[in-house]
Each structure stands twice: as structure tokens, then as C-alpha cells.
């Protein structure tokens, strides 16, 4: 169960205290989320193991910002065949295809030009793994469709944007028994893996609390996201909307899903300031309404009483940090 709420401040005036408490209690009732029962016949996939594949045949969907670099990495992997490339924009597909040519690899099938072109890629019988690097809004639909077609899935974060989507992804993975991997790259970075290794060898004793975050001024990058989808996400949604860079490594160190689980959280933010000014100055938007706070702080409590502290800030002029 997760609960989301704000900590009430102690009232200084005893006369007004009862009135304020009554008013704020109604506004700050924790959001309760219930874990649904697993449908009959489903098995969890936390320990899913399948027979080894001598060759993994891969199809890529989304070749804008992150997709091409994934293709570049995969051309160096033994036991991998890149079978198909897909993006809404044909020029991006052509550019990614040149990566294969430069590496001396066979041409891949290409799909582009239509909103549903990616489905044809997932329908192919010669693909084992679908790699998704599109905008956030499309992740869930693509993951579920691919798994229902018998494919394993690797998807850039986030895997879902609503609780319903999250459970739909989980239920599909469990029902189809397909690997469904969240491509949270920071858990594999040098510092994070070194720290995890030290923790697992007992150098820190018992780890009781972990801290992480995503502090990254995205102002130089907004223009590169197709149709401003990432900027729109930060305008329209409140809270830590990009938590996994800091949360993923913390979960590994605290053995989340390996003996412990996250129980509830408290989250609060400060008013948005830098992004509205940017929108006025650079985009000519008058009186922009931005829901995402300048800084969001989140404190998570686990079932065993441990804590995780997260920060999210993508607009302030400060150095990049995940600590």
C-alpha cells in the first residue's frame, strides 16, 4: 500500500488550531492505493528464467534522442541481430540504418510515416526483443502490445504514467511470462555499481537510509523533444515525475523486492519559478501555468522502517546531480 500526503504544520494559535486542523485534514487525506489480487493463473516475473537464446533478434522503436545511441551500442554485442528499425519520422530511420551499414551489418527492415507503424514491427515473427525509446505517453501501449505478440520488452523510463497502466504492464508480463525490463541506466553507472558492491560486501554495515535524485537543468534540451512532449509533461504534472534515476540505485542497496518493499511516502514541493520565466522569455507565453514545482522532495518509508529521500529539479541553474 502506498500513501501520499503532506505533513501538517503545528498551529501557533490554539484558538485557530482546531479550525485549521479540520480544514487541512480534509485537503490532506492520504491517497490510498490498493494492490489488486493477481488474476488466476498468473505467476510473478521477478525471478523469470527462460532458455538461453544463441542469438537475440531485436527491433527498435523510437529513434529520436536516445534510440540511436542504443542502436550504436547493440552493433557491438555478440549474439545480437538488429532486424527492424521504427520511428514516426523517416529521416530518423534512415539515419539509424546508416549505423548498421557503417558497422558492416545486414540491412534492417524499416517502418515509419504512420502513428501505428510500430505495430508492424511487433508483429514480425523474427523478433525476440522490442526496444522502446519513444515519448513517455506511448510506452505502456507499446510494451503491452509487444508482450502480447510474444516479444520480450526493454523500455526507457517510465514504464507507465498512471497506476492503471502500471498494473496493466505487470499483469501482461505475468500472463505472457515475457521479460519486461525498465531501462533505468543509472543503476549501471560506475558510482552506483561500486556503491552497491560495497554495500553488499558489508562495508557500510546495515544500510538504513538512502538518498538520490534527479537534478538536471533541462533548459538546453527542451527543443530536442518532439512536439515539446517533455516540456509539456513538466508543465502539466506535479510531483517527482522522473524518480527512477535516484530511486533505482537506492532500491538495490536497500533490497527492495528482495526482502523489503516501499510502504508509503510523503512528497512536497516549492513554487515553480525558473520554468515560467523561461516560457515567458523564450517562448512568448504570457502568465504560464506550471504545475511541477521548482524542487520536489519525497521521503519514502519501507515496510522494514528504512527510508529513501529523493529530489527532483529540472529547471534550476545548478550542476547536474543524482545525489
Where would I find each of the regions flagged by the language model?
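Boundary at the C-terminal end of the N-terminal hydrophobic targeting segment
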Residues: 13-18
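N-terminal Rossmann-like dinucleotide-binding module
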Residues: 22-103, 250
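Predominantly a Rossmann-like dinucleotide-binding segment in NAD(P)-dependent oxidoreductases
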Residues: 62, 175-181, 186-291
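A structured beta-alpha segment of the ubiquitous adenosine-cofactor-binding alpha/beta core
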Residues: 107-132
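Beta-strand-loop-alpha-helix segment that lines the small-molecule cofactor/substrate pocket
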Residues: 129, 135-136, 140-188, 202
Amino acid at each position: 500500500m502506498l500513501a501520499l500526503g503532506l505533513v501538517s504544520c503545528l498551529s501557533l494559535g490554539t484558538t485557530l488550531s482546531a479550525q485549521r486542523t479540520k480544514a487541512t485534514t480534509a485537503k490532506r487525506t492520504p491517497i490510498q492505493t490498493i494492490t489488486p489480487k493477481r488474476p488466476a493463473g498468473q505467476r510473478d516475473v521477478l525471478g523469470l528464467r527462460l532458455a538461453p537464446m544463441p542469438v537475440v533478434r531485436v527491433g527498435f522503436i523510437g529513434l529520436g534522442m536516445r534510440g540511436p545511441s542504443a542502436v550504436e551500442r547493440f552493433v557491438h554485442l555478440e549474439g545480437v541481430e538488429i532486424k527492424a528499425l521504427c520511428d514516426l519520422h523517416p529521416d530518423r530511420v534512415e539515419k539509424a540504418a546508416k549505423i548498421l551499414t557503417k558497422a558492416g551489418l545486414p540491412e534492417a527492415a524499416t517502418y515509419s510515416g504512420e502513428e501505428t507503424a510500430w505495430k508492424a514491427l511487433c508483429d514480425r515473427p523474427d523478433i525476440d526483443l522490442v526496444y522502446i525509446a519513444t515519448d513517455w505517453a506511448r510506452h505502456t501501449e507499446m510494451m503491452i502490445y509487444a508482450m502480447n505478440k510474444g516479444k520480450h520488452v526493454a523500455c526507457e523510463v517510465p514504464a507507465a504514467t498512471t497506476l492503471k497502466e502500471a498494473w496493466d504492464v505487470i499483469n501482461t508480463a505475468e500472463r505472457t511470462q515475457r521479460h519486461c525490463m525498465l531501462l533505468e541506466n543509472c543503476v549501471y553507472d560506475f558510482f552506483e555499481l561500486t556503491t552497491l558492491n560495497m554495500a553488499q560486501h558489508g562495508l557500510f554495515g546495515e544500510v538504513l537510509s538512502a538518498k538520490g535524485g534527479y537534478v538536471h537543468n533541462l533548459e538546453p534540451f527542451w527543443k530536442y523533444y518532439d512536439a515539446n512532449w517533455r516540456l509539456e509533461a513538466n508543465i502539466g504534472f506535479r510531483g517527482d515525475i522522473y524518480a527512477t534515476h535516484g530511486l533505482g540505485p537506492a532500491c538495490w542497496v536497500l533490497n527492495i523486492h528482495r526482502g523489503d518493499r516501499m510502504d508509503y511516502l510523503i512528497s512536497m514541493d516549492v513554487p515553480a519559478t525558473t520554468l515560467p520565466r523561461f516560457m515567458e522569455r523564450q517562448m512568448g507565453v504570457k502568465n504560464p501555468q506550471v504545475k511541477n514545482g521548482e524542487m520536489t522532495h519525497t521521503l519514502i518509508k519501507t515496510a522494514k522502517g528504512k527510508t529513501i529521500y529523493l529530489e527532483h529539479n529540472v529547471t534550476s541553474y545548478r550542476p547536474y546531480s543524482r545525489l
